[in-house]
Amino acid sequence: LQQSPASEFEAVTHMSLKDHIKYFSRYHGLNRQDAVFFNQSDLICDMAKKEDFIIMGRCADAILTNNGIPHISIYITAPIEQRIQRAIEVNSGLDRKKARHFLKKLDKKHAHYYNFYTGRSWGNANNYDLCINSASYGIDGTVDFILRMIGRDKDKKKSE
């Protein structure tokens, strides 16, 4: 008995970690990181075809674009000093030097991952529908701004 793509997707989303690793066997011969990337790419596409959702990172902008799936792609940034301050606020015991080092290392890791799997430059404004500096609006203001933009996009699509 063959499962429909939707029921297969439902089954995959409810698997244990051990079962997910077995499921990766369809990417036989790939290293684990590549298998994870291609598996999550399939999941992102399947989810995007079924419903609206928010995903942070995972090269979702490129994955959805390359698969012709309509989406809104947003890149949020802030000056390094504000990011350091925020990192200190949410991670007790982190001093400025460690926070700066952590963020620089994280940015480098994100850029490498994104560049490797997409062939694009991470953070390049041409890759996104909207780029926003959260320092200009604060966290809550940035969220409100994005929600208004998404609402306008949905209203526009309804009227077409």
Question: Over which residues does each language-model region extend?
Answer:
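ATP-dependent small-molecule kinase phosphotransfer cores
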Residues: 1-52
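Small-molecule kinase domains that catalyze NTP-dependent phosphoryl transfer to phosphate-bearing small molecules
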Residues: 7, 11-22, 95-140
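Short, amphipathic alpha-helical "lid/cap" segments that border enzyme active or binding sites
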Residues: 41, 139-147
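RNA pseudouridine synthases
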Residues: 47-50, 57, 63-67
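Conserved nucleotide-binding/hydrolysis micro-motifs of P-loop NTPases
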Residues: 60-61, 77-83, 137-138
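Conserved phosphate-donor/acceptor-positioning beta-strand/loop module used by diverse small-molecule
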Residues: 67-90, 96-105
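C-terminal helical "lid" subdomain and adjoining coupling/linker elements of P-loop NTPases
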Residues: 153-160
